[in-house]
């Protein structure tokens, strides 16, 4: 019996499946992560703006959406790296704006950014962003951005890093 439990645990760890997350499309441009309780923007900034952005522009985008009370709320924020990692779906069913397969659950919209900014800073001049293709962490100068870096806003209590 102990061997069987150990075998199941080893397969679970090796495959990286973990416990399946459950997401609900709220029908108002948001998705609820029923495991964490976080509320996510269903699309991302690229869907709306058709451009990438640097970290400072990402903060401005969130401030604008809060002033507009996106989906009825004014407490949206950039996610932490851990929060973005928690969304990762290794089957990569969603496609980015460039057609690359990315690791978002199918309840999220295809056609968005490949990389998403996080609230996490690295020193004074850099901030972290997350690659949805293969669950990659990167950092860049805050004032630099390219066509692939965007924002997927979240609200709720931040995950600790």
Residue ranges and their predicted role:
Residues 4-16:
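Bacterial N-terminal signal peptides
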Residues 19-76, 150-154:
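Extracellular adhesion/carbohydrate-recognition regions
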Residues 59-75, 81-131:
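An exposed tryptophan-centered "aromatic clamp" motif
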Residues 137-141:
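Carbohydrate-recognition loop of C-type lectin domains
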């Amino acid at each position: 019996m102990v061997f069987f439990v150990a075998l199941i645990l080893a397969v679970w760890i090796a495959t990286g499946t973990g416990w399946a997350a459950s997401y609900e499309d709220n029908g108002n441009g948001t998705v609820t992560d029923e495991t964490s309780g976080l509320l996510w923007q269903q699309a991302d900034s690229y869907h709306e703006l058709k451009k990438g952005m640097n970290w400072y522009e990402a903060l401005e985008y969130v401030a604008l959406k809060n002033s507009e009370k996106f989906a009825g709320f004014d407490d949206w924020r950039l996610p932490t790296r851990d929060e973005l990692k928690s969304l990762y779906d290794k089957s990569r069913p969603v496609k980015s704006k460039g057609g690359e397969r990315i690791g978002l659950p199918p309840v999220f919209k295809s056609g968005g950014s490949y990389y998403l900014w996080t609230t996490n800073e690295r020193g004074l001049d850099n901030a972290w962003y997350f690659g949805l293709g293969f669950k990659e962490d990167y950092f860049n100068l805050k004032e630099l951005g390219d066509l692939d870096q965007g924002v997927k806003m979240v609200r709720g209590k931040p995950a600790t890093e």
